[in-house]
Amino acid sequence: MTTEPGLTLYADAFWISPYVFTCFVALREKGLPFAIEEVALQDGAQHKTEFRERSITGRVPALRHGDFWLAESTAIVEYLEEAFPRSPRVLPTDVKARARARQMLSWIRSDLGALRDERSTTTMFYDRSVRPLTHAGEAAAEKLARVVKTLLPEHGGPLFGAWSIADSDLAFMLHRLILNEYELDPKVRAWADSQWWRPSVQEFVTRSRPTYSAY
C-alpha cells in the first residue's frame, strides 16, 4: 500500500502575497492537508540555491508534492485540480464558466498595475495608505469595480454559479480598496464583503504576522 506524498506550501514570511493567498485558499477549500514553510524574502532566501533550483523560478508561492516542485499560483491551482480530482473543486465544472474564471485569474495578475502599486497588500495588513490614488490608480480601481459589477449575478452570489477561487481573488483585490476606505458601488462592496468572510479567506487574513520589514 502506497502513501500519498505530502504537500508543502512555501509562503512569504509576512503573509502578504496575493498569490500565496490564492494557493492557501485553494488548498483549504480542497480539504488537502499541507505543511507550510515560510521563505524570508526580506533576507533573500528565495535566491538560495536549493529553493531556486527546485522551484525553477525562485518565487513564492511554491508547492512541493513529494519530490515534485511547482511555482506560480495559477499553475499550482491547476495542478491541484488535476492531481486531486476527487477533492472539492476550486474552478467551475462548466467549461465556459471555467474559462471565464481563468480569464479573471489571468487578468488581475496582468492588469491593474497602478492599483497594485498604490494599494499594495502591505496596506491591507500593516499601515494603511495615506496617499490618494493617482489618476492611473483611480482608473484601475474603477475598472476593477466595473468588471466585478458586470460579472455579478442578480442575487449577488458567486460569479460563476458556484464559488471558485476567482471569487476569492477578485474579493482580495477589491479589499485593497475597501481597507483603505475607498467607496465602492454598494452592490460590489456587499459582494466583496460576503466573500471576505469565507472561512478559508479569514484563516489567511487573520493570521498572526511579524513586524514588517520592507524588501
Residue ranges of predicted features:
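A generic structural-conservation signal
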Residues: I36, V60, P186, F204-V205
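GST-like fold's C-terminal all-alpha helical module
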Residues: E4, I108-P199
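Active-site-flanking alpha-helical
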Residues: E81, M173-L174, V205
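Phosphate-coordinating loops and pocket residues in cytosolic domains that bind phosphorylated ligands
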Residues: E53, W197, T206
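GST-like domain detector, emphasizing the conserved glutathione-binding G-site
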Residues: M1-H135
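Terminal-tail/helix-coil boundary detector
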Residues: F204-Y215
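Conserved beta-strand edge residues that scaffold enzyme active sites
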Residues: L41-Q42, W191, R209
